Amino acid sequence: MSNVELRIENIVASVDLFASLDLEKVIEICPHSKYNPEEFPGIICRFDEPKVALLVFSSGKLVVTGAKSVDDIQAAVSKLVEMLSKIGTKFGRAPEIDIQNMVFSGDLKMEFNLDAVALVLPNCEYEPEQFPGVIYRVKDPKAVILLFSSGKIVCSGAKSEHDAWEAVKKLLHELDKYGLIEEEA
């Protein structure tokens, strides 16, 4: 497993700012933003640094997406809080950030016969006419891994990098248990 690589592709977090927001004022201070209350009840705000998108609601709740690290989420929230403070927004307490989903891409550095994998691997689906990968569901930690014949994987649903690694370890354990991992010469 030492040669397996995982890379964060996206992190989604929900945030509570513990403040009520006047979205008409907020839209004026958010660069690269869009607000059309007839279509959507929040502001869609994009930051270039860190490169994320935020959905900002009058309740003071946010959804942050597009982040490549938890630090990016914290930086984006801090940046927004600083901007909101300048227009007189009062906060009940420090923002609360809750990671909802992390998406990783990876490479197991080996190829797989997905028909063979689907025959023996529990908790998986494989419909090659509809999707070219095996969908493997891990219950604990909760995650879904897409496994392709090239050995490339996508892991989603994890709430931390540790959870993603644990899910990948479980997949590798199952693949090994059923004799689906070729030993390198």
UniProtKB/Swiss-Prot annotation:
PROSITE patterns: TFIID. Pfam families: TBP (PF00352). CDD domains: TBP_archaea (cd04518). GO terms for molecular function: DNA binding; DNA-binding transcription factor activity. Keywords: DNA-binding, Repeat, Transcription, Transcription regulation. Sequence repeats lie at residues 8-84, 99-175. InterPro entries: TBP, TBP_archaea, TBP_CS, TBP_dom_sf. GO terms for biological process: DNA-templated transcription initiation. It comes from the Archaea. General factor that plays a role in the activation of archaeal genes transcribed by RNA polymerase. Binds specifically to the TATA box promoter element which lies close to the position of transcription initiation. HAMAP family: TATA_bind_prot_arch. Belongs to the TBP family. This is TATA-box-binding protein.
